[in-house]
């Protein structure tokens, strides 16, 4: 069984852009897709480096993250073939019809983006690979 952690962010201030260096990535490689989504809602540029390993997961997650954020209207670039530079877009577009590349982590990111955008949530079946009760958990925390 893989260990699970919980991160709680509290505060009354806006989030600041982050700069995540290569040496931090190996311990958080599976969290990079959701971190990239969070960065897309922060004013300023965030840089996440050392993402080579994302290219060899269930899909090329680096390209998958890039395509999802770009389709949403986020200013995002891949630098040196292994880093993401992410800036909030002026207008964030619909999250409908985004391609998860049949990758469970990208599918969860799309579902989270749909929650943030207030859109209909697409719980793709591929999510069950790593988080079988994701849909049920999300439904318990959503309040109309």
PLM region descriptions:
Residues 1-144:
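Short, structured segments at the rim of ligand-binding sites
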